[in-house]
């Protein structure tokens, strides 16, 4: 779509009315994100680009589309997404995001990078050229996220990061762990310098930072942050020139608090941008994608055009692509969404590069799922000596005090507490009555066979175990359970499928979703994946769990960059202190 001289000359002749257009969309209400107005008009399209708005000459076109008075808005953009946690391949993802009006993703493939390094990223991108949406990558900056505190399958150093930043498909340096900036790790500073040299912005991950720490982070050149949970955090970031990505994922529900605050404080939305970060396929199908962020903001009282700006032109400006994306004006790519109204954001028609790609909630053409390289289908290698005893936590005495990870509803952050648990047979016991369950992370790359064991509150399981090979960002096998035998079985079932989500009860596998592509993504169409997730969520509910997205929640407990605690295969991590702490702190 960058074009050449001949193509540009052709577009100019069409713009001047000298040659026929490819497509003429007439009888529409154009939502202008520059002037924040709506006007009746038409769009002339050539070579996938808008070349004229409301021309004063009679239009000739190969195809004429009557919008029948519908509202025309620019294609929606997700400013920060990880494709892998949708559990879909990029091809399968098209069927669930494009009908909701998403035409551009800014995606950080850190998940596949942590599993398989640069060749994993390249394999993922090899199958994206002919999709009905555009992918720009946020080049993974943290592979691994916490060196020395986790085991990963792949590593991306400065050389690999610089190579990806030089590519036209990259838009930015992906989110940087604050600890690397605050401790002035030169390897990570080199990645920021590379991004600047290549004309790319650097994305942030400023979770839990105070004002003084944010000053350091902003000085390093981190340009945005998607981790604001309350309005005060968003406001502080804006004050320091850090743009705020307003997130609504499966477990990170931040739109209401942040948009409400912006409305109440009469805050300009110019530097507010929508993203999803991590959202399961079933939530996208039921709610929408970026369209859901827009609709929710409008329902909260935000001016519809401002909400649309947060999904279009604000995003394009941030990534320095507003010469090409984000508005329905001449010279921009013809990514167009037609809506019946600006209250329920449910697209009637979606155009990508001037081609009709979705209508009435369905793609106009089926997308085939590609074959992925064999190395991505062979990423799970369990420790050879793994057994139920691998999940035991030895202790002296009759009871012991342990560090516990406590969940917050609808958030990925957690808080730490210390609780007393009984000891029997020399092993620490779970307490299902108090909802204190065992948590484990099993190294799955065949490197060291390490197993980290801890405790978590918030899952409310009364029996069995849940497990996932999606566990941020290292993507080892994370398991929550009431007993060691079911936890061991869950790990083995994941290995049998070379990745997946699993539910186990009393020595029986009661549910599984295989994720053979890197242990992260399914090779099935979206409808089948959605059905299997729904079944798994019901199985989790039968075991006592009342979380709306239990497997998404489980995947974040192992993240060593989200406060307060995280569990990896190396042990329990104090996130802000960036060190391993003991699970058992006292016995008696």
UniProtKB/Swiss-Prot annotation:
GO biological process: adenine catabolic process
Cofactor(s) required, per the database record: Mn(2+)
SUPFAM superfamilies according to UniProt: Composite domain of metallo-dependent hydrolases, Metallo-dependent hydrolases
InterPro entries to which the protein is assigned, alphabetical: Adenine_deam, Adenine_deam_C, Amidohydro-rel, Metal-dep_hydrolase_composite, Metal_Hydrolase
Transmembrane segments: none
Reactions accelerated catalytically: adenine + H2O + H(+) = hypoxanthine + NH4(+)
MF terms (GO), sorted A to Z: adenine deaminase activity
Keyword Hydrolase: yes
Protein's UniProt keywords contain Manganese: yes
Keywords: Hydrolase, Manganese
EC number: 3.5.4.2
Protein family per UniProt: Belongs to the metallo-dependent hydrolases superfamily. Adenine deaminase family.
Protein name: Adenine deaminase
Species whose genome carries this gene: Desulforamulus reducens (strain ATCC BAA-1160 / DSM 100696 / MI-1) (Desulfotomaculum reducens)
């Amino acid at each position: 779509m960058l074009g050449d001289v001949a193509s540009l000359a052709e577009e100019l002749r069409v713009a001047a009315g000298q040659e026929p257009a490819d497509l003429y969309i007439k009888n529409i209400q154009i939502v202008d994100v520059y002037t924040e107005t709506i006007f009746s008009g038409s769009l002339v399209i050539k070579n996938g680009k808008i070349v004229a708005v409301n021309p004063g000459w009679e239009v000739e076109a190969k195809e004429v589309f009557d919008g029948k008075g519908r509202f025309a808005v620019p294609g929606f953009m997700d400013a920060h997404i990880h494709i892998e946690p949708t559990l879909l391949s990029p091809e399968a993802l098209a069927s669930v995001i494009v009908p909701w009006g998403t035409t551009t993703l800014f995606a950080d493939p850190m998940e596949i990078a942590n599993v398989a390094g640069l060749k994993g990223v390249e394999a993922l991108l090899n199958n994206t050229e002919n999709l009905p949406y555009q992918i720009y990558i946020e080049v993974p900056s943290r592979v691994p996220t916490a060196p020395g505190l986790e085991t990963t399958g792949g590593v991306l150093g400065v050389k690999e990061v610089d190579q990806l930043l030089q590519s036209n498909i990259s838009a930015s340096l992906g989110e940087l762990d604050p600890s690397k900036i605050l401790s002035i790790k030169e390897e990570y500073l080199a990645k920021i310098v590379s991004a600047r040299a290549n004309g790319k912005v650097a994305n942030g991950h400023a979770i839990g930072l105070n004002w003084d720490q944010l000053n350091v982070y902003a000085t390093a050149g981190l340009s945005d942050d998607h981790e604001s949970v309350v309005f005060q955090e968003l406001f502080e970031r804006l004050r320091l020139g850090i743009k705020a990505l307003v997130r609504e994922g499966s477990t990170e529900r931040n739109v209401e608090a942040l948009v409400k605050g912006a409305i109440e404080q009469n805050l300009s939305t110019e530097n507010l941008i929508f993203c999803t970060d991590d959202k399961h396929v079933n939530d996208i199908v039921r709610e929408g994608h970026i369209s859901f962020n827009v609709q929710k903001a409008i329902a909260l009282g935000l001016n519809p055009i401002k909400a649309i700006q947060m999904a279009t032109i604000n995003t394009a400006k941030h990534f320095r692509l507003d010469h090409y994306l984000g508005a329905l004006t001449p010279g921009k790519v013809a990514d167009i969404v037609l809506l019946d109204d600006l209250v329920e954001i449910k697209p009637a028609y979606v155009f990508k590069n001037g081609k009709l790609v979705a209508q009435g909630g369905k793609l106009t053409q089926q997308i085939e799922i590609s074959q992925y390289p064999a190395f991505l289908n062979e990423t799970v290698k369990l420790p050879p000596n793994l057994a139920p005893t691998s999940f035991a936590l030895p202790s002296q005495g009759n009871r012991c005090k342990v560090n516990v990870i406590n969940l917050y509803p609808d958030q990925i952050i957690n808080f730490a507490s210390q609780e007393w648990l009984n000891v029997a047979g020399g092993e620490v016991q779970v307490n299902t009555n108090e909802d204190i369950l065992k948590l484990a992370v099993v190294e799955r790359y065949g490197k060291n066979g390490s197993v980290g064991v801890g405790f978590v509150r918030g899952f409310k399981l009364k029996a069995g175990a849940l497990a996932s090979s999606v566990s941020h960002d290292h993507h080892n096998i994370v398991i929550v359970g009431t007993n060691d035998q079911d936890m061991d079985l869950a790990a083995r079932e994941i290995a049998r499928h070379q990745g997946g989500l699993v539910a186990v009860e009393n020595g029986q596998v009661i549910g599984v979703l295989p994720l053979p592509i890197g242990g992260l993504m399914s090779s099935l169409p979206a409808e089948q994946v959605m059905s299997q997730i729904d079944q798994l969520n019901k199985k989790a509910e039968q075991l006592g769990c009342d979380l709306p997205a239990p497997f998404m929640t489980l995947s974040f407990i192992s993240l060593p960059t989200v406060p307060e605690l995280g569990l990896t295969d190396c042990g329990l991590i104090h996130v802000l202190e960036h060190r391993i702490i003991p699970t058992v702190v006292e016995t008696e």
